[in-house]
Each structure stands twice: as C-alpha cells, then as structure tokens.
C-alpha cells in the first residue's frame, strides 16, 4: 500500500498498485512501477489486499486498469466512443464552447483520461491537455495512440497531451484563449459514473488548488475560463 504526502492540508493520496497478468511480464511491470513511483504487487496478494484493490495491469502488449473491489469487474482501457457525449450534438460542455470560436486554443488544466479534451477538440478546437500524474499520463497516452475509429482520429490529433503541473506550466501557454478546469473528484458518490471515472474518483486525489490558480490567472490574459464542478460544490 503506497501513500504520498502532499503539501495541501496534509492530504494523503492513494496510488494504484501495478501488477501483471503473466509471469513473463514481471520485469515490464517493475519498470513501469519504477518510472512512476508505484508499488508492484503479486496478483494473489492484490486479491486479498485489505487496503484497496485498484491496479494497473502493465505488459509490453497493453496497459489496463481494474478495480477488483467491484464485483465482476474486468480490466479495461479507455474506449472513447463509449462516451456518447463526445459526438453528441448538444451537451452541457458543448454549450460552453461556441462553434464560431472553432480553431481557437483551449488549455485543459486537468486532463485525466482526456475525455473532455476530446469532446472539446471534436468541435474543432485545438486543445493542450495537461495531466500531473505521470502514470495517468502514460496510460492515457497509450489509449489515445490506440484509437482506431476514423470519426475521432482528427480530434485526437488536435490534442497536445502534456505531463506536468498545469499551474507550473500555465505561463507557457499565454497564446491560448480559453482555460478549462474540471473538478471531477467532487462528486464521489455518483453511482451513475462510468467505471473509468469511478476508478479515478476512488483514488482520492487531492483537489485542484483553486487559490493558487486564482493568483496565477491574475498574471495572464485568458479570454474565458470554464470551470466544471458538481452542483453541491
């Protein structure tokens, strides 16, 4: 069980385990875990873990996520077309973006799986999506590179996916007109959330530092800031 301490309110963050589906992939899993400061766990130990059972199955062929605490769960990667909102004509997110502004640059500060970034780029925007967690960045990069559906290939190509702290990097993107921020971890009890989103919510990431963001934005001239949050927040 791995815990990392953050500076914000003495927050403790839970990290996923790394494991393997075949003994032939042990070395690959170990290298993946070392790159991202994660803990490797044997499959049999994962199933009896008393802390949590969220895992990245790492192999030379694929990267898959699974939460074994959920009954009948299966390993998965991101199937972007299963998120119908990406191609939907009208969604709450799409209403925030005018078709007249298509082609402009958007800076997504909380990329995650790049699901919202892909929905925005599907409208024709150029999206720079920044993800802080290196393991999540590598997993999502793998999923984006393996998109086979022609109807969203162009949208994927309009995403510039970056690994780093968005608040450290924001000054590098002063040419972007729109800032997008999703506090996706606010609504943890939503049973309707897809397994992909629930996987991240169950890891109890630290909340985005809005105070630091406010100070940073004072030094920039972005034309629009779109902040997505649960209604109760």
Predicted regions and their residues:
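Conserved beta-strand/loop positions that form the S-adenosyl-L-methionine
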Residues: 109
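Short SAM/SAH-binding signature in class I
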Residues: 176-181
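Conserved SAM-binding loop of SAM-dependent methyltransferases across substrates and taxa
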Residues: 113-125
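Mobile active-site "lid"/loop adjacent to the S-adenosyl-L-methionine
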Residues: 184-212
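S-adenosyl-L-methionine
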Residues: 5-104, 132-175
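Conserved SAM-binding motif I beta-strand of class I
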Residues: 126-131
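Conserved Class I SAM-dependent methyltransferase catalytic core
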Residues: 210-233
